[in-house]
Amino acid sequence: MKFSQALLSLASLALAAALPHASTPVYTPSTTPSPTPTPSASGSFATTSGIQFVIDGEAGYFPGSNAYWIGFLKNNSDVDLVFDHMASSGLRILRVWGFNDVNTAPTDGSVYFQLHQDGKSTINTGKDGLQRLDYVVHSAEKHGIKLIINFVNYWDDYGGMNAYMRAYGGGDKADWFENEGIQAAYQAYVEAVVKRYINSTAVFAWELANEPRCTGCEPSVLHNWIEKTSAFIKGLDEKHLVCIGDGSDGSYPFQYTEGSDFAAALTIDTIDFGTFHLYPDSWGTNNDWGKLWITSHAAACAAAGKPCLFEEYGVTSNHCAIEKQWQNAALNATGIAADLYWQYGDTLSSGPSPDDGNTFYYGSEEFECLVTNHVETIERSAK
């Protein structure tokens, strides 16, 4: 999901427009001990079985949500509150940002995970860095919630690919996927995060990027990057699933102008399942069209013999009336194994969590419609 920073209630991060450097980035290793969470006694690693997901030994259809912001919270009680509410509501999967890239280190105590500056990549493992994600993983383990952890954003929110290009060079997003220096910095970060949580059963999947695309590129650019990067991750960690995080065909439905080929990506052995997003308002289509979008992706996944994750979907009004149709379409489509609405909202110690217009909050009528009732429908269908 692309969203405006002006809509975020969390403190925005300062990004400096540093001049590009042609040098190969130098990865600065962490000197802070990494308190890697211990796997929960009752949990097991998520896997797939044909076109289904298997969570803690249970094969079926699973509901979940997105809360990109949870790793940036500095109050542990807020993190626990979110997972308490999710678990009691029957939500099983939460997708979070495992990235927070800056070109200038914040001086106000804001959380950031990686600094790209002067051709160097420095991973922040301090209390305002990956230790915040550590607690998210720890709390997820405690509450039985599975996490999808994403490594970089296509969009500029929380740094994104442009934060890399400002530090290491590159003129457009195509350069990001093919520039050796950029990819060295990216892979160093991926390796650090994967190794940090490699033994955690709370991790559902590693995700390459949020909505990666390459406007005007041949599909081979993205495909080759997906193939190379997913193989790199599998070489580090064979225990966890790997997915792309693509919105599928970009902002222009059923076209390849964004350099994405959904069906072709499903053929990559080191990609375990498909992901796709749905925002008709942003794409100039009507809400009813969304059901076709869902069933077409389900068919592609079924043909490939891999599960589909309906990973993001949202509207800014009439949540229940519109999104309920999409949930039902996904639940009844052969090939879809889970759905994650965008996005989860809750009342934290500092006030409401971020609202980008698509958010609906725990305890609201919309939450009852799209979470409580949806979970009940899933449970009935499993009997």
UniProtKB/Swiss-Prot annotation:
Compartment(s) where it occurs, according to its Swiss-Prot or TrEMBL record: Secreted
Enzyme Commission number(s) from the entry: 3.2.1.78
Keyword annotations of the record: Carbohydrate metabolism, Disulfide bond, Glycoprotein, Glycosidase, Hydrolase, Secreted, Signal
Catalytic activity: Random hydrolysis of (1->4)-beta-D-mannosidic linkages in mannans, galactomannans and glucomannans
Disulfide bonds: C214-C217, C301-C308, C320-C369
Residue numbers annotated as active site: E211, E312
Biophysicochemical property: pH dependence: Optimum pH is 5.5.
Record flagged with keyword Glycoprotein: yes
Gene3D superfamilies: Glycosidases
Principal place of residence: secreted
A GO biological-process term: mannan catabolic process
Molecular function terms from GO: mannan endo-1,4-beta-mannosidase activity
Cellular component, GO, one term: extracellular region
Domain of life: Eukaryota
Keyword NAD found: no
Temperature-dependent activity: Optimum temperature is 52 degrees Celsius.
Binding annotation for substrate: W97, N210, E211, P212, R213, Y279, W283, W342
Positions annotated as glycosylated: N75, N199, N332
Subunit and partners: Monomer.
Protein name: Mannan endo-1,4-beta-mannosidase A
Source species: Emericella nidulans (strain FGSC A4 / ATCC 38163 / CBS 112.46 / NRRL 194 / M139) (Aspergillus nidulans)
Organism lineage string: Eukaryota, Fungi, Dikarya, Ascomycota, Pezizomycotina
Chain's gene name: manA
